[in-house]
Amino acid sequence: MFPQEAEVVVIGGGVVGSSVAYFLARAGKKVVLIEKGCKGGEASSANAAFVWSITRKPGIDIRLAMHSFDIHRQLKAELEMDFEYVRGGGLMIIEDETQLTFVEAHLQKRAEDGYPIELIDPDKVLELEPHLAKERVFGAAYSPIDGFTNPMFLVLALNLEAKKQGAGLFHHPEVLDIEVADGQVKGAVTDKGTIKT
């Protein structure tokens, strides 16, 4: 049965929306997640699946990436379903002297901020990734903390646990409008009915 009210309506059921629904439901909120298509069928199904810090800029960008690592480790321990999170390290391949100069500056700033990243020589790069074209490898930046996940499995795992925590998950309704009165959201209008908040 389609809900008529909720404390929180989460619009979008990809990795971000499913994460929001899971953490709010776990905190005891009455949550409804609305996804107009299939579970994780939009951006979450088309991303590179990296849990990645190597290319992040110093400051808030790298701090958010580091927080993402913490959340992935937490979710790996909490969620029943394996979402294939692997922390196997990451490489940013350097192909010439110009790229090397750029990467060295990036590495220096990252090292100053205390994040693990190092410059490795072509032999070490090819040891880690032997299928690269040897003649094009000048070196690489290597981050031992980077990894990847299966975003589709992550969405499914989050949905499963959010539902166990009491969240309502609805796939295929479309949110058409947001009702606002006196500066507050009062509801989400969908093609299946309005959910009051």
What annotation goes with each model-predicted range?
Residues 48-128:
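Dinucleotide-binding Rossmann-like beta1-alpha1 core, especially the glycine-rich loop
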Residues 98, 129-137, 179-186:
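A short, glycine/Asx- and small/polar-enriched loop/turn
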Residues 27, 113, 165:
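Conserved dinucleotide-binding and phosphotransfer motif residues
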Residues 141-197:
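Helical element adjacent to the flavin cofactor pocket in flavoenzyme catalytic cores
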